[in-house]
């Protein structure tokens, strides 16, 4: 008897190795039929289920089915069910799969559908689409296919009804997405609760916790047989039934599914390629194992390779996952015989190295190396991190830099004498060679012309037979072939002829030092001595005479000075062109600089920024002592500020001046000693080496680019050069040391550097050759690299001498100070105390209320004891000056948590508990039990003693949120100045502390994730490679964090104490190497010296500018505006107080254009909460800035009636004050607040204490969802400004709109605005209809048009620009209208606008022609103004009047 249909299905599950055979969804499942198409090898499986499978299960089953029959046929699946009701969640879950399956042949519709999702309501399936075009195309081409695809997967028949949301289609789509995400989160929470219940009986009052990680190594599924072949990932190119791979995990993520199960996804690499791996959990044990899988571990994985429809890539579906031990590279040398790496680049070497000093030093420490150096290109920005890792690991850090050094000037003439230059006979010569090395390469052509007064007297042109065939590269560069030189005269013959040719003449050439090197080497080889005649180099001569030229190549100069050069890179043509140029140059030099004699030339070799034109060479510089570190900081600063040209440069004389306490090494192949040895020979290298303290040689692979370019002929020549470098050190008795020039950690990291260098294109010379192997080598690897020197010598260079250099450097050098060094302000402590106590007594009476007395003493004790008085006094001076100059200052951050800041005039926010105080008799009454959240919410009340209306104040903010519980945290006083006033405030710091003591806070910009991903894609394109998505992720990860540029904090000002200088803390530079910048910045990222030197944040903000504009327009003092005005408060619930309806302004509140409360997101919050007073607005401000605070937290609590806007957690300080009001200890309350605001949750023991204090469960649950929170003082300051502005909006509307459009608006549609509300509404509709396709400029304009529409609906008008009245930038009030400024005209910039006004003030414009000429207005703008009747009173041209 055959198998039943149900049994056939069971057999099918076994055949495809499906892991979830017992899933309840398979109950009664059966095989209805299998239709086999033999010719096309396609099998259709017709299956029966009770209902459509949960999507996650369907995906897993479908993939297993496809893989199970991969080698037999292509499989399709059709499902039948008795299902009659629609399941909304299932339809949504399947949506993406269905769309990709059904309409992949119409990409536009496919993309449009993937951006939305269907909804089911009362059995009707609807779909929001963006526009009518999409709707029509769906009906014509797609809906039937989509509906049919659903039915083939077991869904009942249904129709999809598309519709267009006319008001905000894109917003609707986003809302749908958010709804589904919320549903996912809710299901995930239920799943977590179920897991908790099954695993252990815990206290019901506690929140469900995630499954705890399992003990021991990871093992999911079975142990993978060690005999099973591990496949390299690069060899997997298609789907496979089963593979075993092993690799390093670099990304891991666990996702809760709606089914209650978990999906583990991780990315793994074996460094040949990478894969994404997926595994669905089957039970809580597996989920405990999932929690153990983290980035950084090594795993072995077995499972099928399948094309994943979601990821659109090959993915491994793991059956078995085993943690394995990976044996990394080890330094096998004895512990007392390890090397020290003295040449290491970190991520601070701009776009050139891929590992941080932390990673490099940690590896060195792990290998047992006693020390490691940091030597980045031209900067020391890794020093703070280097110091930190040295402190943690105990490894000795050697602080250095690979500098770009230049000779101060290149000689204009060699072998100078006192001969006259005029009327001399000159021999201008040029050589063509087989390469760049005078030692290893040969001259193959020597050409010269003898000239006098610009006329050619005689020519010399000889080929030289080098004795070997010419390389293809030589022929390509010189156009000289082997046949041309074969049989020519010998070098000795030609050189002797040339020597005779030059007698009695002055010699010259272009870049002649190169040619002289070959000639002198050849002369000496044949015992002719060196060239004795004066030799003029036209290259530095041209640079001196014409410093502003962009290039000085011979062809460039010939073109500029109209000198014929027919065959560049042929010696005879080059020589004659150079001769004609020399004649012109010498005449110019005499006329401009009175250069008449040969020895006059070198008097000018350092002029006209000669350092810019010298070719930089690399020098390794180490700080040997603390004094040396300061000198190094000075050199870095000078190189960035005084001598920057393309790269930071250090002139040799400057290096010599600051050499005390420094050790100098010869660096890499770009060092002058190695270059001299390679190109000019031992003697010249010897002379240059005398300048250095130690000689560096590097592994042969480091020099591979020189071999590739044929600069060094072969490995034999390279070994000769390196042996001579060693010999040179021995002769000079200088230490010769083997260094690695490390740019990355391990060999497989080299590709990250290739990607970074590739991203810079042809501009980077490193792109012209293959990159050498410059990983961090172990002692034994390094010894092996230098084995050609012999075992003893290799050990000396690699181990003995590297340790010797390290020992010569002091052990206790500190690049970062160990404490704070605030600036000095005489009497600061006393002044802050006096100001505080005096104001306190003025406000609260004498004696002070105990509460006020205690709070002030608490704060002043911390401030004075920890040396923070000067911080406060600087802030007080800045605020006082700004206020005096007519600009209010808003505080940011937590400074409003300090009553000392309030009483000394730094902030308007009062952190004391809500209270009344009488301004007449100083009667006070405080509310300390949480009765009120803000003093601004208190009802108006007269003093019970004297009858004066009392001041209402206090926001109940603990001081601890500012300076920490112990009051010793360095204060970060952030102040919001008007954007107009910010530069004045910045420069005032120079007035207070002196020009040399004030700097901008520097920043370092590194490669971000998205940028790195772009680099990877570019690398794929340029190298014609294609990587899997997981491999792209790995490569992008490897390229992130590398320094790209530098910048400056927009507000941070660093202040140096007057008894120190900036070099005690950091070098300085210009931001982004911009030599025209107004301020120098710290070279170190300011975060790294935050605890050592004072930084003031003097920010620019629109709110104070707006307040000043409102005050100027109205004459009303903004500080007199009440904070509880009923009309103003009504704005936050309805626009009625403005005299308009919701429909008229398309908003349910009246807060359009109000800072903090005008965005769509916050207006939605207002609609949900209907705030009635200041403290509730303060809550809104906190909720809108936090993360994990509003969405799926406070919003739900309010909607469900569990809490109100008044008592949900809005700001971080609420937590501390709330818990104290519940009766908890203040220190524990503070610690809980700190944990929660940083997203760290609440430890179990603290949760116990919260339960004991009867803190509600909803409150604790809310805390556990929070990731980041806003400071209450910050929110209080922002709301204060917002309410002042709102007051003008309600009661002085035209003043408000005038200020808003003048201060906060940059984008206008002045035509629509001047044509009235219908035109404005039409323009708004046009932008809204574009949805996400609207440009950023259009989205900004939409915000402005919303305000314009509101103003028009309130009965006011806009007027087009008025040529006689309009301001350049500000809108003007004219009756019930606003006149547009000139900058509102499209395409008319602010500079032209100012020019128009300035010209008009001189005299009225007579005509359009006059406007164009004096106003600098283009014809396009004239046409616009004409079309819009702005110029109706002006004729086209000026007209003369006879009478």
Curated annotation (Swiss-Prot):
GO terms for cellular component: cytoplasm. Residues 426-582 form the Exonuclease domain. It holds the Pfam family HHH_6. One of its GO terms (biological process) is DNA-templated DNA replication. The keyword Nuclease applies. HAMAP family: DNApol_PolC. NCBIfam families: dnaq, polC_Gram_pos, PRK00448.1. Required for replicative DNA synthesis. This DNA polymerase also exhibits 3' to 5' exonuclease activity. This is DNA polymerase III PolC-type. It comes from Limosilactobacillus reuteri (strain DSM 20016) (Lactobacillus reuteri). The lineage of its organism: Bacteria, Bacillati, Bacillota, Bacilli, Lactobacillales.
């Amino acid at each position: 008897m055959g198998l039943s249909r149900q049994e056939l299905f069971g057999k099918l599950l076994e055949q495809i190795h499906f892991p979830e055979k017992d899933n309840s969804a398979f109950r009664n499942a059966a095989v209805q039929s299998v239709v086999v198409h033999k010719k096309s090898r396609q099998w259709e499986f017709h299956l029966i289920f009770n209902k459509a499978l949960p999507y996650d299960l369907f995906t897993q089953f479908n993939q297993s089915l496809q893989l199970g029959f991969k080698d037999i046929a292509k499989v399709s699946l059709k499902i039948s069910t008795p299902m009659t009701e629609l399941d909304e969640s299932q339809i949504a879950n399947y949506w993406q799969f269905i769309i990709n399956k059904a309409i992949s042949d119409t990409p536009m519709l496919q993309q449009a559908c993937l951006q939305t999702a269907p909804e089911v309501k009362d059995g009707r399936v609807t779909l929001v689409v963006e526009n009518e075009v999409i709707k029509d195309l769906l009906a014509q081409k797609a809906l039937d296919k989509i509906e049919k695809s659903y039915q083939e997967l077991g869904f009942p028949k249904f129709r999809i009804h598309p519709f267009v949301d006319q008001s905000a289609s894109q917003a609707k789509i986003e809302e749908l997405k958010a709804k589904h995400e919320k549903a996912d989160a809710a299901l995930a929470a239920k799943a977590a609760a179920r897991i908790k219940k099954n695993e252990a009986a815990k206290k019901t009052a506690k929140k469900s916790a995630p499954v705890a990680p399992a003990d021991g190594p990871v093992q999911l599924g079975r142990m993978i047989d060690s005999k099973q072949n591990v496949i390299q990932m690069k060899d997997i190119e298609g789907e496979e039934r089963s593979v075993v791979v092993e690799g390093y995990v670099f990304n891991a993520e666990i996702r809760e599914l709606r089914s209650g199960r978990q999906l583990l996804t991780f990315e793994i690499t074996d460094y040949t390629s990478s894969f994404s791996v997926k595994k669905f959990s089957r039970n809580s044990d597996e989920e405990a194992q999932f929690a153990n899988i983290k980035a950084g571990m090594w795993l072995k994985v077995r499972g099928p390779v399948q094309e994943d429809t979601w990821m659109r890539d090959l993915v491994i579906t793991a059956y078995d996952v085993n943690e394995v031990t990976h044996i990394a590279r080890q330094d096998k040398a004895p512990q007392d015989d390890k090397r020290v790496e003295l040449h290491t680049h970190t991520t601070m070497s701009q776009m050139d190295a891929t590992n941080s000093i932390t990673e490099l030093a940690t590896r060195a420490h792990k290998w047992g190396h006693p020390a490691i150096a940091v030597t980045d290109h031209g900067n020391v920005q890794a020093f703070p991190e280097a110091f930190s890792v040295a402190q943690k690991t105990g490894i000795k850090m050697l602080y250095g830099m690979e500098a770009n050094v230049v000779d101060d000037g290149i000689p204009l003439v060699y072998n100078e004498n006192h001969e006259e230059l005029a009327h001399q006979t000159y021999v201008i010569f040029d050589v063509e060679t087989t390469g760049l090395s005078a030692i290893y390469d040969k001259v193959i052509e020597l050409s010269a012309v003898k000239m006098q007064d610009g006329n050619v007297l005689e020519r010399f042109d000889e080929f030289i037979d080098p004795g070997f065939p010419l390389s293809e590269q030589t022929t390509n560069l010189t156009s000289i072939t082997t046949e041309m030189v074969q049989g020519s005269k010998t070098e000795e013959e030609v050189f002797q002829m040339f020597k005779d040719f030059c007698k009695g003449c002055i010699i010259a050439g272009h870049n002649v030092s190169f040619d002289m090197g070959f000639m002198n080497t050849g002369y000496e080889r044949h015992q002719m001595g060196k060239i004795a005649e004066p030799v003029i180099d036209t290259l530095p001569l041209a640079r001196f005479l014409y410093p502003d030229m962009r290039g000085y190549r011979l062809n460039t100069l010939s073109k500029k000075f109209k000198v014929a050069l027919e065959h560049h890179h042929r010696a005879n043509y080059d020589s004659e062109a150079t001769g004609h140029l020399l004649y012109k140059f010498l005449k110019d030099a005499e006329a401009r600089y009175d250069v008449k004699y040969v020895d006059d030339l070198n008097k000018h070799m350092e002029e006209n920024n000669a350092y810019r034109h010298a070719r930089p060479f690399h020098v390794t510089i180490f700080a040997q002592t603390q004094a040396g570190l300061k000198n190094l900081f000075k050199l870095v600063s000078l190189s960035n500020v005084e001598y920057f040209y393309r790269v930071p440069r250090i002139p040799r004389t400057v290096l010599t001046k600051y050499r005390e306490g420094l050790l100098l090494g010869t660096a890499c192949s770009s060092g002058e000693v190695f270059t001299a040895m390679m190109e000019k020979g031992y003697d010249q290298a010897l002379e240059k080496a005398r300048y250095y303290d130690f000689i560096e040689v590097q592994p042969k692979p480091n020099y591979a680019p020189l071999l590739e370019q044929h600069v060094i002929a072969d490995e034999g020549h390279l070994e000769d050069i390196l042996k001579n470098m060693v010999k040179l050190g021995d002769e000079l008795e200088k230490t010769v040391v083997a260094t690695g020039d490390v740019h990355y950690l391990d060999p497989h990291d080299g590709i990250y550097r290739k990607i970074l260098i590739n991203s810079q294109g042809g501009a980077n010379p490193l792109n012209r050759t293959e990159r050498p192997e410059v990983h961090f080598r172990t002692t034994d690897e390094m010894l092996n690299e230098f084995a050609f020197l012999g075992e003893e010598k290799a050990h000396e260079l690699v181990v003995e001498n590297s340790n010797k250099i390290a020992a010569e450097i002091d052990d206790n050098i500190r690049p970062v100070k160990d404490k704070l060094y605030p600036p000095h302000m005489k009497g600061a402590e006393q002044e802050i105390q006096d100001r505080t106590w005096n104001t306190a007594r003025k406000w609260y009476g004498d004696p002070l209320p105990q509460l006020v007395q205690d709070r002030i003493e608490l704060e002043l004790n911390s401030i004075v004891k920890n040396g923070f008085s000067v911080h406060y006094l600087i802030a007080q001076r800045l605020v006082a000056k700004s206020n005096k100059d007519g600009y209010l200052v808003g505080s940011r951050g937590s400074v409003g948590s300090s009553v000392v800041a309030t009483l000394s005039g730094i902030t308007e926010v009062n952190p004391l508990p809500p209270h009344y105080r009488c301004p007449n008799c100083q009667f006070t009454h405080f509310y300390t039990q949480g009765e009120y959240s803000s003093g601004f919410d208190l009802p108006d009340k007269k003093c019970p003693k004297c009858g004066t209306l009392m001041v209402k104040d206090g926001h109940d903010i603990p001081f601890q949120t500012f300076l920490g519980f112990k009051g010793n945290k360095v204060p970060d006083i952030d102040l919001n100045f008007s954007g107009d006033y910010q530069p004045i405030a910045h420069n005032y710091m120079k007035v207070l502390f002196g020009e040399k003591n004030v700097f901008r806070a520097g920043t370092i910009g590194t490669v971000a994730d998205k940028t790195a991903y772009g680099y990877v894609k570019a690398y794929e394109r340029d190298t014609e490679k294609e990587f899997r998505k997981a491999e792209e992720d790995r490569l992008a990860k490897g390229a992130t964090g590398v320094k790209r540029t530098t910048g400056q904090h927009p507000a941070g000002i660093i202040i140096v104490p007057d008894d120190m200088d900036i070099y005690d803390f950091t070098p300085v530079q210009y931001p982004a190497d911009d030599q025209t910048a107004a301020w120098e910045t710290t070279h170190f990222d300011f975060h790294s010296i935050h605890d050592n030197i004072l930084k003031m944040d003097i920010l620019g903000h629109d709110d104070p500018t707006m307040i000043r504009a409102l005050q100027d327009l109205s004459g009303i003092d903004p500080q007199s505006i009440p904070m509880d005005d009923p009309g103003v408060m009504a704005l936050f619930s309805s626009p009625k107080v403005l005299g308009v309806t919701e429909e008229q302004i398309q908003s349910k509140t009246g807060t359009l254009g109000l800072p903090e409360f005008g965005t769509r997101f916050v207006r939605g919050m207002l609609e949900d909460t209907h705030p009635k007073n200041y403290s509730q607005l303060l809550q809104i401000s906190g909720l809108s800035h936090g993360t994990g605070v509003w969405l799926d937290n406070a919003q739900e609590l309010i909607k469900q009636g569990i809490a109100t806007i008044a008592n949900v957690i809005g700001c971080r300080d609420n937590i501390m004050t709330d818990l104290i009001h519940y009766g908890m200890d203040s220190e524990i309350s503070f610690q809980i607040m700190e944990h929660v605001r940083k997203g760290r949750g609440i430890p179990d023991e603290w949760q116990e204490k919260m339960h004991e204090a009867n803190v509600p469960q909803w409150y604790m649950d809310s805390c556990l969802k929070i990731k980041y929170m806003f400071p209450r003082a910050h929110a209080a300051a922002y709301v204060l400004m917002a309410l002042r502005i709102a007051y003008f909006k309600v009661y002085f509307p035209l003043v408000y709109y005038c200020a808003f459009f003048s201060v906060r608006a940059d984008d206008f549609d002045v035509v629509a605005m001047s044509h009235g509300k219908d035109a404005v509404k039409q323009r708004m509709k046009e932008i809204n209809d574009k949805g996400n396709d609207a440009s950023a400029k259009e989205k900004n304009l939409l915000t402005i048009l919303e305000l314009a529409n509101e103003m028009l609906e309130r009965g006011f008008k806009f007027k087009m620009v008025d040529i006689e009245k309009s301001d350049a930038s500000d809108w003007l009030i004219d009756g019930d209208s606003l006149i547009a400024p000139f900058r509102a005209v499209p395409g008319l910039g602010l500079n032209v606008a100012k020019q128009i006004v300035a010209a008009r003030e001189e005299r009225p414009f007579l005509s359009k022609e006059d406007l164009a000429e004096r106003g600098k207005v283009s014809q396009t703008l004239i046409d616009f103004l004409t079309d819009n009747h702005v110029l109706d009173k002006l004729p086209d041209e000026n007209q003369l009047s006879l009478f």
